[in-house]
A protein has these predicted regions:
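Long acidic/polar interaction regions in large eukaryotic complex-forming proteins
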Residues: 59-141
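Polybasic, proline/glycine-rich intrinsically disordered low-complexity segments
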Residues: 168-205
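Amphipathic interfacial helices
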Residues: 118-152, 159-165, 181-188
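Intrinsic-disorder/low-complexity, polar/charged segments
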Residues: 102, 151-152, 168-169
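Beta-strand-enriched cores of mature, soluble protein domains
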Residues: 43-51, 114-115, 119-126, 130, ...
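Active-site/pore-lining binding-face segments in mid-to-C-terminal subdomains
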Residues: 156-158, 176
Length: 205
């Protein structure tokens, strides 16, 4: 597994205070302080390895618990997406090719113009394309742009620790799979894994 060399997020740029304020209003619990998330490496190499092993482990057909978690995730994401589009005025475009060379470009566009562009992913086992798009918008707006953090692994984990507060206990395991499992496995192996729908053991949440 690729070592996690940095003890803090590597890509740090200006925050988006308006998005942070909306998150603070709609969060189900108090998130960690933005200063802590922006300056502290909270994902240990051992934990990253456990996440990767879990995500890439044997994959079974989604059971009832998994389906219920993903239904909750889709419902709650739709609500938070409405906060992004109605309260913050975020406008989303769909493109065929990746429009950004860096996280800094994405976050600057959101912060300065309230717009962002998505390239749709492959088919997901349980989420529709629109549901998956909404989750990515929520993650980018209330995670990356609000905190001013990039796509390195410590930054991704910090955005998770912020965004997890937007979801209920039922939806949170599914959100973890989508927002932590895939990117951690990608960084750990150097190969982009396929989309999966599975729930992590409680010790990883």
């Amino acid at each position: 597994m690729t070592a996690i060399d940095l003890l803090q997020p590597a890509e740090v740029f200006p925050t988006w205070p308006r998005a942070q304020r909306e998150l603070d209003v709609f969060a189900r619990e108090v998130p960690p302080a933005p200063h802590v998330l922006r300056t502290t490496g909270l994902l240990t190499p051992a934990r990253a390895e456990r996440i990767t092993d879990w995500f890439l482990g044997a994959d079974a057909a989604p059971d009832g618990d998994t389906r219920r978690a993903y239904r909750a995730l889709a419902r709650e994401t739709a609500h938070v997406f409405a906060v992004a589009t109605q309260c913050l005025g975020v406008r989303v475009r769909i493109a065929q090719e990746e429009p950004y060379e860096s996280a800094a470009e994405l976050c600057a566009e959101l912060r300065e113009h309230g717009t962002m562009t998505l390239v749709r992913e492959a088919t997901h086992p349980l989420l529709s394309p629109d549901e998956l798009d909404r989750l990515r918008v929520v993650h980018d707006v209330f995670g990356h742009a609000a905190l001013g953090l990039g796509f390195d692994l410590q930054s991704e984990y910090a955005t998770w620790l912020q965004c997890r507060t937007l979801f209920s206990a039922q939806a949170r395991p599914a959100a973890f799979c989508e927002l932590v499992g895939a990117v951690t496995a990608y960084v750990g192996t150097g190969e982009k894994p396929g989309l999966r729908a599975k729930l992590p053991p409680a010790a990883l949440l």
